[in-house]
Amino acid sequence: GNTVMIVEHHREVIALADHIVDMGPEAGINGGQIMYQGSYENLLKADTVTGRMLRTKTPMKMEYRKPTGWYQVEHAKLHNLKDLSVKLPLGVMTVIAGVAGSGKSSLMEYFMSQYPGEVISIRQKDIGINLRSTPATYLDIADAIRALFAKANHVAQAYFSFNSKGACPACQGKGVIISDMAYMDSIETVCEVCHGTRYSKEVLKYQYKGKNIAEVMDMTVRQAIQFFEDADFVKKLDTLVQVGLGYLHLNQSMTTLSGGELQRVKLASKLDERGQIFILDEPTDGLHLDDIRRLMKLFNRMTDQGNTLFIIEHSLDVMKDADYIVELGPGGGLAGGSLLFAGTPKEMLEAERSVTREYLRESL
C-alpha cells in the first residue's frame, strides 16, 4: 500500500516502474520541463533523450588497446581481499567490477599503497569540499574574476570575496542561515538579508560589463565563457563543458552536487595529463544514459593520450567500452574478495565463474 518515488537512471529500474516522469530536455537552466509521463512501453516510443537511449543498446567494443605494461598485485589481504593476486594492465581502460562489497575499492586501495609511481585518485571521498566550495573556487578562477572587478572599480579585490570583506554580515557569506536543532538535523534557510547571494549590499553596487559580482557568479559555466570571452581562465571553464558540466553555476555550492558530478569537477582539472594512472570510483553515479555516453568518449580520449584508467563501476555500458575487466566476488563482505575474472569484455562472456557475465550477455 506504499507509494514509492525513485529518482533513477538505470535501465533496469526504469523498466520496473509503473509510471515514469521524464524531465528535461537538458540539465540546469535548460531543464525543468516534463518531457514525458506514462508507461515504460510508451517511453520506448517517445522522442525524448531518455526514450532514444533506452531504445538503443550499447554495442560491445571488439577491438582492444594493447597494454603498455603490467603491474602484478601479489597476495593482497587488505580488508576482505583473500590473498588476491592479479596482473593489472597499464596504458588501457580497465573496469574493476563486482557486486557491492566485493572488494573493488580495497583492491584499488592496495594497488595505490604498493605502486611506486604517482596515482591520481578521483573518488568521492577524496574530494575535499565544504559549504563555501564552488566550481569557481575549486578551479581556482574566483580570484581572477575578483581581480577584473577590482580593476574596473578601483577598489580592493577582497571586497568581491564572500569569504572576506564582501561577505554578507548576516550569514557571513554562506548564503544560508543554519539553525542547530539540538536533537534533530540542522535546518538551512536562505539568508533574508542577501537573499542567498552571499555578498553585502555595498559590494553589489560595483559592476563589471554591466553586471555585479553576484550576477556574474550566478552565471552558468557556458554563460560565463561567453561573458568573459578572451580571459585566460576561460580555458578552465571549458574543461567543465568537456566533462558535461556546462550547466553548473559558478557559485553553486558543491555540497549540492551528486557523487558523479563531484568527480567530474575534479576530473576537469586533469584533462591535459599524459602518461598518468587514474582511479575513478563509480564515475557514472547519478548520471543519465546520455551523460554516460559522453563521459565514455572523454575516458577514451584520456586513454588515447597515454593514460591508464582503472574505473570501479557497475554500469554495463561502461564495461562494454572497456579494454579489460577485473571482476571480484562472488558476494559482498566475507563472501567476496576473490578474483572471478580478468580479461577482455568479449572473454567475460565465456567466463563460467563470472557473476556479471549473465547480465552482460542480456545487455547486448
Q: Where on the chain are the PLM-derived regions?
A:
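Conserved phosphate-binding elements of NTP-dependent enzyme cores
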Residues: G1-L364
